């Protein structure tokens, strides 16, 4: 497990400390990630959470561990308030788009998986949909009810948080703090403000597409139930890591813990480590899908940005730090990633990596990278190490190619296969591909070399008409970029 040098240290939200990570079974990690609610496309704020979880998984594998990764798909149960009021988000989307909730879920799930691929996020070993586990959830809820943890009101079956002495420990709020929180909703008949729905009963005359029979009446599971049920189903009663966004801490993960500990009733922590990724902001405000805002991965592509440029942008900030999104920031990230790819792609062309042995300098770079990653996934420092290696003239091409492969095991930013030209995606509406632009730029460079400046100017004008800006450099080389 420690074959690569440093011990991996991670921040545990439950303890608020960075500590050495040790899975319950040495060398093997059970990891559960809260997946998307598939009522709309996931915006880039959502995708930051999944890039973080992917970086964590890659780091665990980089350290020699075997990871069993499970992710849910919420296709029922998530209300518009995130708590216990409002309509189911899938039902709202179905009315909005005049389609069935099942069609909505299927289409947006497919879109989400496409975006995972675009960002080189490794898919989980197990996908699990809430609607495929309804009976499991009913059985789980019945067990809680039988043990005296729940009470029934017209709105459904509710968990009595006052019976849990450690309720709110993850959020450091407790019952009083939860009652004061903005996201705690009032439902008629609830005994306490922190009580939450385990099963929601459909109201008389309510016309829902997604509802099932249960001992408490026809209805649907509460949002928090699916993650407890499916994580235990696929990872066992106790597992190592649970990930999500910081917005999951005060309600969703707090309630998952309460019902899971009550169900297990064995005095052991349900999950060993809780890790949460921070928000990315747009002009100072959290990017939010529920408020109708947000930029999609497809929007990045339409603007001519390779999705891995966005991944690179995210890795420039620590996962526990908020960061800002802007098109200027994307442009800067593209420049930074292009610089790395320029060096690694050139080395790749001339290298015989199969014969490479790392010398002292290369070994030091790899050790520094390992140290950065082992310090709670310190990707900003890790990227600085990558940049230092790219600038190190003492490294041979083969060494650099081997290092690129090791670095990219964790970073996933295309160091082993992308070229600078690959970053220049044609924006939406472009009349030519990046390859066609590259051919014109090469032709223009030849004209400049031959001092055929008339032809050079004609080609520059042609490129401008195609939405391309050409930059000529002092060393005689040229580069290009889309104008939008």
Name each region found by the language model.
Residues 15, 24-120, 140, 475, ...:
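N-terminal, positively charged nucleic-acid-binding surface of large information/translation enzymes
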Residues 2-4, 286-289, 293-484:
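Structural preference for alpha-helix termini/caps and helix-kink/transition segments
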Residues 61, 145, 464:
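Anion (oxyanion) recognition and catalysis
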Residues 92-100, 125-131, 217, 245-246:
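The substrate-binding groove and active-site-proximal loops of carbohydrate-active enzymes
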Residues 1-39, 54, 114, 134-348:
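Alpha-helical recognition segments enriched in aromatics with Gly/Pro capping
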Residues 66-68, 148-154, 393, 469-471:
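Short, well-structured beta-strand/strand-turn elements
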Residues 123, 153-154, 473-477:
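Short Gly/Ser/Thr- and Asp/Glu-enriched loop/turn motifs at secondary-structure junctions
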């Amino acid at each position: 497990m420690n074959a690569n040098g440093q011990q991996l240290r991670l921040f545990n939200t439950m303890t608020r400390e960075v500590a050495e990570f040790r899975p319950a079974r040495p060398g093997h990690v059970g990891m559960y990630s809260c997946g998307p609610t598939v009522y709309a496309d996931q915006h880039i704020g959502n995708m930051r959470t999944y890039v973080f979880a992917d970086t964590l998984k890659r780091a665990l594998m980089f350290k020699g561990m075997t990871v069993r990764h499970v992710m849910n798909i919420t296709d029922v149960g998530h209300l518009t308030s995130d708590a216990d009021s409002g309509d189911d988000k899938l039902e709202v989307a179905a009315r909005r788009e005049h389609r069935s909730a099942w069609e909505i879920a299927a289409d947006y799930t497919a879109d989400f998986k496409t975006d995972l691929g675009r960002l080189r996020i490794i898919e989980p070993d197990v996908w699990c949909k809430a609607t495929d586990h309804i009976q499991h959830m009913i059985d789980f809820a019945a067990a809680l009810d039988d043990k005296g943890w729940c009470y029934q009101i017209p709105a459904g079956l509710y968990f009595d948080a006052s019976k849990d002495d450690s309720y709110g420990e993850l959020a450091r709020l407790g019952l009083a703090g939860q009652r004061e929180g903005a996201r705690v909703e009032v439902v008629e008949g609830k005994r306490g403000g922190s009580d939450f729905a385990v099963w929601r009963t459909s109201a008389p005359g309510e016309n829902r597409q997604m509802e099932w029979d249960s001992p408490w009446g026809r209805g649907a599971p509460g949002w928090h139930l699916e993650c407890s049920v499916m994580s235990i189903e696929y990872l066992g009663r106790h597992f190592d890591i649970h990930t999500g966004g910081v917005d999951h801490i005060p309600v969703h993960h707090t309630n998952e813990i309460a019902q899971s500990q009550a169900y297990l009733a064995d005095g052991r922590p349900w999950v060993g480590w809780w890790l949460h990724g921070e928000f990315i902001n747009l002009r100072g405000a959290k990017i939010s899908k529920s408020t109708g805002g947000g930029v999609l991965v497809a929007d990045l592509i339409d603007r001519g940005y390779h999705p891995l440029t966005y991944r690179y942008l995210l890795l420039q900030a620590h996962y526990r730090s908020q960061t800002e999104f802007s098109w200027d920031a994307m442009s800067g990230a593209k420049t930074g990633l292009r610089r790395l790819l320029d060096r690694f792609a050139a080395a790749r062309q001339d290298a015989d990596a199969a014969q490479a042995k790392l010398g002292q300098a290369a070994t030091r770079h790899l050790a520094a990278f390992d140290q950065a990653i082992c310090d709670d996934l310190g990707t900003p420092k890790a990227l600085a190490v990558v940049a230092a290696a790219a600038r190190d003239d003492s490294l041979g091409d083969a060494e650099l190619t081997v290092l690129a492969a090791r670095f990219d095991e964790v970073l996933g930013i295309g160091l082993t296969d992308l070229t600078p030209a690959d970053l220049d995606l044609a924006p939406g509406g472009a009349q030519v591909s990046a390859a066609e632009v590259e051919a014109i730029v090469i032709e223009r460079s030849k004209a400049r070399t031959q001092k055929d400046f008339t032809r050079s100017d004609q080609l520059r004008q042609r490129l401008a008409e195609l939405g391309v800006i050409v930059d000529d450099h002092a060393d005689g080389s040229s580069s290009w970029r889309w104008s939008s």
